[in-house]
């Protein structure tokens, strides 16, 4: 059984551990500042999803696979009860886990994603990534120039370029498993979370400038997460924690520290 790669902050702190999962083409490093800050209060596990970062590669990538990975991670680290936070694809993973294993989850935070099916919307990015020939490129700059032919937003190119690394045979490559992410894309993006209910305290956080969570999604959210609320973070798009970290961190801290009766 392979265990997800992680970086742990605040390991010596008491309190329920918070497990944090990034989005598609991301990695745990995207959440480094958040982990450091929250690790002052309770243990925080920043985790690479399968086929991302330094976690194992696999041909399988369903929501159930992602949920099982979280279960195995908990067992390996001897965690009994956890708080979960997931952004985008990571949000789908934590929703699926909470519905399958509700007894293991104290509180759930879902960042800028709903439990619904989404139409495919990363084709341009996947095409850009597949257009890079690592037999030919010799620098990060060359890779970024190729990506720029397909992707106009500099911030997206920089986000993707964080995944570049030098292999043992002195070639650049992606840390994520592009083959599986491309082949299984519809499995994890176009599929809704399996129907089920998680009754624990749940917070959905959306970016004011993002369209991933729409007002009409709130009915389905309440069906599956009856004890949930939706908070919108101003001056933030889909990458909420990066675009307005001050407000985002405050909202998360408040939610996790509340003791409701």
Which role fits each region the language model picked out?
Residues 228-261:
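Catalytic active-site module of serine/aspartate enzymes centered on a nucleophile-bearing elbow/loop
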Residues 96-99, 106-138:
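Flexible "cap/lid" loop of the alpha/beta hydrolase fold
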Residues 23-26, 88:
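Active-site glycine-rich loops that stabilize anionic/oxyanionic intermediates
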Residues 135-189:
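Conserved alpha/beta-hydrolase catalytic His-Asp/Glu region
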Residues 7, 35-39, 45-85, 89, ...:
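Active-site loop/oxyanion-hole signature of alpha/beta-hydrolase fold enzymes
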Residues 1-19, 39-42, 79-80, 225-227, ...:
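Alpha/beta-hydrolase fold catalytic core
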Residues 169-224, 229-232:
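Conserved serine/cysteine hydrolase catalytic core
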Residues 25-33:
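Serine-hydrolase catalytic-loop signature spanning alpha/beta hydrolases and amidase-signature enzymes
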């Amino acid at each position: 059984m392979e265990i997800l790669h992680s970086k742990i902050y605040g390991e010596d702190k008491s309190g329920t551990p918070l497990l944090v999962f990034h989005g598609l083409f991301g990695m745990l490093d995207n959440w480094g500042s958040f982990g450091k800050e929250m690790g002052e209060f309770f243990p925080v596990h920043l985790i690479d999803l399968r086929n991302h970062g330094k976690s194992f590669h696999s041909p399988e990538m369903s929501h159930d696979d992602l949920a099982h990975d979280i279960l195995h991670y908990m067992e390996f680290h001897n965690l009994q009860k956890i708080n979960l936070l997931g952004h985008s694809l990571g949000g789908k993973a934590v929703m699926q886990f909470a519905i399958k294993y509700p007894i293991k989850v104290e509180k759930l935070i879902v960042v800028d994603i709903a439990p619904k099916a989404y139409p495919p919307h990363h084709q341009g990015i996947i095409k850009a990534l597949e257009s890079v020939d690592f037999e030919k490129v010799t620098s990060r700059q060359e890779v970024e120039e190729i990506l720029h032919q397909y992707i106009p937003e500099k911030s997206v190119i920089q986000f993707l370029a964080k995944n570049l690394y030098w292999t043992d045979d002195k070639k650049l490559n992606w840390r994520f498993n592009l083959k599986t992410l491309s082949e299984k894309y519809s499995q994890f993006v176009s599929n809704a979370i399996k129907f089920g209910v998680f009754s624990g305290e749940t917070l959905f956080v959306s970016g004011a400038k993002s369209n991933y969570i729409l007002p009409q999604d709130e009915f389905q959210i309440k069906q599956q997460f009856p004890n949930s609320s939706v908070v919108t973070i101003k001056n933030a798009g889909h990458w909420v924690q990066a675009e307005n970290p001050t407000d985002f961190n405050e909202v998360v801290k408040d939610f996790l520290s509340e003791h409701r009766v």
